[in-house]
Swiss-Prot record:
Xref: Gene3D superfamilies: Ribosomal Protein S4 Delta 41, Chain A, domain 1, RNA-binding S4 domain
InterPro entries per record: Ribosomal_uS4, Ribosomal_uS4_bac-type, Ribosomal_uS4_CS, Ribosomal_uS4_N, S4_RNA-bd, S4_RNA-bd_sf
GO function terms (MF aspect): rRNA binding; structural constituent of ribosome
Family listed: Belongs to the universal ribosomal protein uS4 family.
Role description: One of the primary rRNA binding proteins, it binds directly to 16S rRNA where it nucleates assembly of the body of the 30S subunit.
Species annotation: Maricaulis maris (strain MCS10) (Caulobacter maris)
Cross-referenced Pfam families: Ribosomal_S4, S4
Domain S4 RNA-binding: 94-173
GO BP annotation list: ribosomal small subunit biogenesis; translation
HAMAP family documented for this protein: Ribosomal_uS4_B
Keywords: Ribonucleoprotein, Ribosomal protein, RNA-binding, rRNA-binding
GO cellular component: small ribosomal subunit
Protein name (database record): Small ribosomal subunit protein uS4
Amino acid sequence: MSKRHSQKYKIDRRMGENLWGRPKSPVNSRSYGPGQHGQRRKTKMSDFGLQLMAKQKLKGYYGNITEKQFRRTYDEASRRKGNTAELLIGLLESRLDAIVYRCKFVPTVFASRQFVNHGHVKVNGIKVNIPSYRCKPGDVIEVRERSRSMALVLEALDSPERDLPEYIDLDAKAMKATFVRMPEFSEVPYAVQMEPNLVIEFYSS
């Protein structure tokens, strides 16, 4: 198993949930955490523990992004007018690597980060190699022509594992998508329950 796959499944085991709904996730066959103490009976979590778990789960889902990046996203959401939890999710979903993953150009969010890093993606006709790049409504995201025949891309597009959300308009044949609008939390096709309100409580306490 590659280091990247190992990291992904370690997050699943730590959270005790199949974060991305992947059929090969180890939690499909066992429900305890990683390591030699993973099978110990879990005690009831404190409010802080639940808040921390919610934060770690959301960070993990988006490719285990750094605390610095995640906190910066929260700070931006809290400065904007509106529901901070909804805004946090909208900002996370507008990341370029998240949109590339939603479009099924790649099989995992980890692969999406690497795919963007390696220069395989254009935004509005310009190559962008920053996974955390913030897309705006109306932006056109596409796989570069030279990268469209990659087995990774073709296999991911054929996968039935994920549904395309309504806030992304995809032309799968052209490998091009438009980020239509910022999503509402209820629209995001998470495979598990996310609790952004607990994340807000974590940073607000």
